[in-house]
Amino acid sequence: MTLSMNLGADSYDIIIEHGALAKASEYLNLNRKVLIVTDSGVPAEYADTIAAQCKAPTKIVVPEGEDSKGFPTFELLCRTMLENGFTRTDAVVAVGGGVVGDLSGFASASYMRGIDFYNIPTTLLSEVDSSIGGKTAINLGGVKNIIGAFHQPKRVLIDPDVLKTLPPRQIANGLAEAIKMAATFDAELFSLLETEDILANLDTVIERSLMIKKSVVEQDEKESGLRRVLNFGHTIGHGIESYEDLHGLYHGECVALGMIPMSGGEVRERILAVLKKAGLPTDLHFDADRVYEAVTHDKKADGDQIHVIYAPEIGSFEMKKVSLAEFRQTIKEAFAQ
């Protein structure tokens, strides 16, 4: 299956195909210098399979986890390209999850003011969400994604077969982003997640999630309006991640927790049920004041107000700009339950 992201001069294809990794050179221009970036948690054969199809590959394996998404690793990537004589005609290929994609994308956006970038996601979270849309970033001072750029990939290659090596917790981590999109845009997908065997329907979950995000990004590439809806669960989720000092909980797990206060009544109960079915945490046992302090550093804060996304009904959303005082009370009430 091929989806086309229509962004004018920055348009690109999203290839979804079982076994695509072994024939990546049919879809990606690897006949040049290529920096392949992966991490220690990704099976080595994935990056090696790509390297074997490249004319002049250079491979970097960064440590697994959020600690790699910072300036030291970013500098390592840029310095490696510099020392190996990379020019604007060369490319970076990310083979990994969200951390690898964000880091590699930002390095490719920055080196020589931008070189080609290909994304080959190997986690469910990156396959359903972070591999498309052009957001690239690194962390600073415990704040997620505070330094970054919009830099669209030239192509995204999704091979669902790589998910077979993922542990159940990583599958659940990715499902959080699919639940987020279903809760705000696609009641039919949400119903599938509620009633069907999720693992048996992963291909459908991936395709439907990507179609939602593709449509949103095409309408609002730089997140000035509609794309903010994709932050459902992320404002409080990022606060929890920062509170946790980027350790302990995965990104999707934090997003799952962040969705709970942004819904109510029957909608909240349905979201809670799907989160539990997917194996995601639902216990808000954090210090509300510390989470709030972390949230005030969030990119969605605007002076003494903050942009928030609510799910009033499954498959719909409401964008609001509320005072920080009101938002603080929302957090306190949710975390007190």
Positions of the model-derived regions?
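Residue-level signal for inorganic ion chemistry
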Residues: 17, 36, 70, 121, ...
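Solvent-exposed alpha-helices and their adjacent loops that cap or buttress functional pockets
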Residues: 6, 85-87, 110-111, 139-140, ...
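ATP/NTP phosphate-donor binding region
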Residues: 1-91
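Phosphate-handling active-site elements
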Residues: 83-89, 112-119, 242-253, 268-269
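Active-site segments that bind and position negatively charged phosphate/pyrophosphate groups
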Residues: 192-290
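Short glycine/serine/threonine-rich phosphate/pyrophosphate-binding segments
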Residues: 99-106, 127, 238-239
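A glycine/threonine-rich phosphate-anchoring loop and its flanking beta-alpha core
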Residues: 15, 21, 29, 106-196
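C-terminal charged capping/lid subdomain of soluble metabolic enzymes
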Residues: 11, 176-178, 267-337
